[in-house]
């Protein structure tokens, strides 16, 4: 059953990521990997909320964990795309954008997880 839940969550997470990437490219352009940045930061925030809620309710080994954490958020966020897009920025000579993507993703991602945990503990 857990594989089905992970697969279903992954299907939904991958489609949500595709929608975010498409939306970001349409609204913000493609000179910076905005979509991946937004997906990774919002995914970090959602992960923080989910971990706090699941931990506080002793549900870390529950079916919801497989669906949400391994499935949905595992497919929604994407480290491999982040690293590839960062490499492309550096190769294109956009060093400032490359550094902004790497440092911003890590720093803001950590902040997003922290804020998500704080918010999740309110529930």
What are these regions, as identified by a protein language model?
Residues 1-123:
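Membrane-interface helix-loop junctions in multi-pass transporters/channels
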């Amino acid at each position: 059953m857990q594989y089905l839940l992970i697969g279903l969550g992954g299907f939904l997470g991958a489609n949500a990521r595709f929608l975010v990437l498409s939306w970001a490219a349409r609204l913000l352009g493609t000179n910076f990997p905005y979509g991946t940045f937004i997906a990774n930061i919002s995914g970090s925030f959602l992960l923080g909320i989910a971990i706090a809620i699941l931990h506080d309710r002793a549900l870390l080994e529950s079916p919801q964990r497989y669906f949400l954490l391994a499935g949905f958020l595992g497919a929604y966020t994407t480290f491999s795309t982040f690293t590839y897009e960062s490499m492309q920025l550096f190769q294109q000579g956009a060093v400032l954008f490359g550094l902004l993507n790497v440092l911003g993703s890590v720093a803001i991602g950590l902040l997003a997880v922290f804020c998500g945990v704080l918010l999740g503990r309110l529930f």
